[in-house]
């Protein structure tokens, strides 16, 4: 099989849902903007060489419906011949698209695909079609399949004895690492500024107005966070005996990411500079009511298939859906703290469901290079009870 490379990956800044810079921005518009920038950043890439757009989205309906991947391809500067397909594996949708593109290239059916993910929670949450949403048989037999993600986080905390203190301590670390990374400019290369219009609402009068803004950084993190502040927050999903709070959970946010996946041969032929090799991907199911622990099963499976050990991995990007599941996975598998989410994660910078996996791939590409590492893992839990894991290797020319 052919070598598959990640040539480049860009993303928007992550903006707070409903209150941030993208609260009036369509998902297809922000993604098409990234496609155009990706073409500009890689002048050797002939737009006509791109064969498909595979885009992940956790809620592909409403403003994100109508096969958003095809909409993005048509909105962008790609030729009309470039197709598009939308993928939904909830929080691993962005990683799933990279894996799908990679296997298509690996097999020889394609040479160049744009993958990625997007989520505009601002324009979709509360506006989804709930007609006949619940399958009564499924709900009766496996009720956890319909649990809110926060409920599953509480389940993990209680079932595996993850304390409130451990969750808050991890959340604080995420905030501190993101603040340090932003101060050092470690996210700058992956973020593409975007001019847009946001809606502001006066809290006292309710008056609304639109203002022009430029989203050029992540605005969700709170550098001033303290352990005392986190410990004072009330549980959201189980007010009486719970431990999952707004402070130790991922933040609702809007954003997009696009990743260029190519055969090594075609990339070099065009004079492009790859950043990563794609080395594998796996998905494993688990009980839906504890969906957060999915990577406990998918990580060992992928390492076994790649004939690697835990100590061979130089960088771990584990999506921070909730601190309870991150702490459990970390402690169960023995993930080293100094290699895990080294620049923070979704608790501090936000989690637009469909885009996070693609964002993580782009971040691994840059951080592996900074550290001189070889292997990086991107992994996350998935709604419905799954774990998804991707393996990447730093590119050596």
Predicted regions and their residues:
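N-terminal extracellular/periplasmic Venus flytrap/periplasmic-binding protein-like
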Residues: 10-13, 24, 28-33, 44, ...
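Short, well-ordered amphipathic alpha-helical segments that serve as non-catalytic structural scaffolds
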Residues: 27-43, 68-72, 97, 149-156, ...
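Active-site pocket-lining segment
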Residues: 55, 152, 190, 196-200, ...
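Active-site-proximal alpha-helical scaffold in enzymes
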Residues: 87-118, 157-187, 258-265, 330, ...
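Glycine-/small-residue-rich "gating" segment that lines the acyl/pantetheine channel
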Residues: 121-158, 220-245, 397
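Conserved beta-ketoacyl condensing-enzyme motif
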Residues: 22-112, 117-136, 191-215, 310-332
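Conserved catalytic cysteine-centered active-site region
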Residues: 25, 57-111, 144-151, 224-251, ...
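Condensing-enzyme catalytic core mediating Claisen C-C bond formation in acyl metabolism
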Residues: 1-27, 225-293, 297, 304, ...
